Amino acid sequence: MSSLLNISHCSYHGYSGLTSRGGINTVENHRWVWHNNGVRLSFPRAESSINITMGCTLQRGIAKSLSQENLVELSDENDDLCPVECVTEFKTDDELLSVLEKSKETNSLVVVDFYRTACGSCKYIEQGFSKLCKQSGDQEAPVIFLKHNVVDEYDEQSEVAERLRIKAVPLFHFYKNGVLLESFATRDKERIDAAILKYTSSES
């Protein structure tokens, strides 16, 4: 029986976040899966069924200028973080492919956070990533937020991580119309925010 992964969504409102201290080298595109000329994903046919009710929405507007002190204060308070269901966890290639296929119906951007439980930088960016799918926004720019633990229950590299040759985390992938547009490793929420704005603008 095929697995069923339900995705609930909320809305996204961009604003400035904490900057990273110390960069992580960007991971190259995985050419064995993708080509620079836009060849689509070549995973096996999906057997999983994933229900997407609606995409997270992005509100374009002037970014709020918040000081680092204010951001630290906000992170310590219960400031209505996006519910856990907003950032959906997937475990298999089939689940990822199913989301990518369904995202074509709404022209949604799919953002994937690849993480490891024992990774300090992954924990650092997790809250910021959750905040990126919070608050009401513009219905014209749907965004789907996903995450994947690159280490499986046997403390081995996951099938997805092995297939995508993921070597560094936290790593973020940006997909649209089933195509990987960009990937980079970072703990800087502003960089993720900028990529989302770039790929959900009217020109993209």
Curated annotation (Swiss-Prot):
Cysteine-cysteine disulfides: 119-122
GO cellular component labels: chloroplast; chloroplast stroma
Record: transit peptide: 1-27
InterPro entries named in the record: Thioredoxin-like_sf (IPR036249), Thioredoxin_domain (IPR013766), TRL4_chloroplastic (IPR044176)
Pfam family membership, one: Thioredoxin
The keyword Transcription is assigned to this record: no
Keyword Repressor assigned: no
Listed Gene3D superfamilies: Glutaredoxin
Domain Thioredoxin stretches: 63-201
Subcellular locations according to the entry: Plastid, Chloroplast
Record keywords, A-Z: Chloroplast, Disulfide bond, Electron transport, Plastid, Redox-active center, Transit peptide, Transport
Active site: 119, 122
Superkingdom of origin organism: Eukaryota
Function: Probable thiol-disulfide oxidoreductase that may participate in various redox reactions.
Family: Belongs to the thioredoxin family.
Protein's UniProt name: Thioredoxin-like 4, chloroplastic
